[in-house]
Amino acid sequence: MIEATIEGVLPRAMYRVRSSEGRLMRVGVDAASSGIIVKLIVGDRVVVRIAARDPGRGQIVRKL
């Protein structure tokens, strides 16, 4: 899991984030966290779990 900053809001509850390492990724909200995380906007810091098969995708685990 890595820390990232939201850079853009995409359709279908997806977000474009930039990791602390500088990598740009497309992520969605984890199903378990969807009820906890109410709203995410550009500039919010989040913790992202990277997908095993595609390092350019992941899921938001929690908001910092």
Residue ranges and their predicted role:
Residues 33-47:
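Short nucleic-acid-contacting surface segments enriched for D/E, G, S/T with interspersed K/R
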Residues 11-17:
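Short aromatic-glycine-enriched beta-strand elements
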Residues 1, 24, 35, 55:
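Short, mixed charged/polar active-site loops
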Residues 1-11:
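Structural detector for short beta-strands of small beta-barrel domains
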Residues 52-64:
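OB-fold/S1-family single-stranded nucleic acid-binding modules
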Residues 23-31:
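A short macromolecule-binding patch
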